[in-house]
Each structure stands twice: as structure tokens, then as C-alpha cells.
Amino acid sequence: MMTDPIADMLTRIRNAVNAKHKVVEVPASNIKKSIAQILLDEGFIDGFNVTEDGKQGIITIDLKYGPNEEKVISGIKRISKPGLRVYARANEVPKVLGGLGIAIVSTSKGLVTDKVARKEGIGGEVICYVW
């Protein structure tokens, strides 16, 4: 039994990037699809698609690298964990590396980046940092 599926997804992405893989597969869920969509919108991955396998489905993520095979995702870190939840008010939403990275925040309007949360004046649970 997996206790933290989001941390598992982030670890799979981190390991695949460090091993220079082109794609990585993770078990699907709605929150993982939202995280993948944010990573795509922010330019950290090339794309993703969801395939049905008769159970929960699989998300295949196409990883992105620079022209000389340098990593686009240099770091990805889980912040709010099942044993220690981390919440931030609208005025406390953190900036990652002075704005170079993103924080993914779970709000009442779904998963959004730190920039969107600050702009709309909403806080929530800080899921992870990506830089």
C-alpha cells in the first residue's frame, strides 16, 4: 500500500530526469493529472497522455531537456506530506528561488501555481516546489 502517491510521482520524475529518460509512467489520478498539466503549462515537461489499463490508468509523461541534454527540471521537492501538512495564507504563498521555480498549491479553485494563488489572493496547501 502506497501512503503518499504524489511523492511517488515526484520521485519517479526526479529519478527519470537524473537518469536522462525520455518518458516516465506513473499511475493515474485526478490530482496527478492536474500536477502534470501545471508542469506542462509552465514548460517543465513536453507533454503527457493518459492511457486506460482497465484499472486506474497510466499517465505517460514526456520529459523535457535543453539543446545540450541539460535538465529542465533541476529539482522537485514534496513540501506538504501526509504526516506534516503545510498550509499558506494568500499573503504567505512562497516564492521558489526568487521566482525562478514554481510552487504548486492546492486551493479551493483546484491546483494552481504560486503566481496564480498570489494574483487571485487565495491560499491553500503547498504541495511541492519545482525548479
From Swiss-Prot:
CC per GO annotation: ribonucleoprotein complex; ribosome
Cystine pairings recorded for this chain: none
Function description: One of the primary rRNA binding proteins, it binds directly to 16S rRNA central domain where it helps coordinate assembly of the platform of the 30S subunit.
Lineage: Bacteria, Bacillati, Bacillota, Tissierellia, Tissierellales
Pfam families from the UniProt entry: Ribosomal_S8
Keywords annotated in UniProt: Ribonucleoprotein, Ribosomal protein, RNA-binding, rRNA-binding
Family listed: Belongs to the universal ribosomal protein uS8 family.
GO molecular function annotation: rRNA binding; structural constituent of ribosome
GO BP term, pick one: translation
UniProt subunit comment: Part of the 30S ribosomal subunit. Contacts proteins S5 and S12.
Domain of life: Bacteria
Name of the protein this chain belongs to: Small ribosomal subunit protein uS8
GN (gene name): rpsH
InterPro entries the UniProt entry points to: Ribosomal_uS8 (IPR000630), Ribosomal_uS8_CS (IPR047863), Ribosomal_uS8_sf (IPR035987)
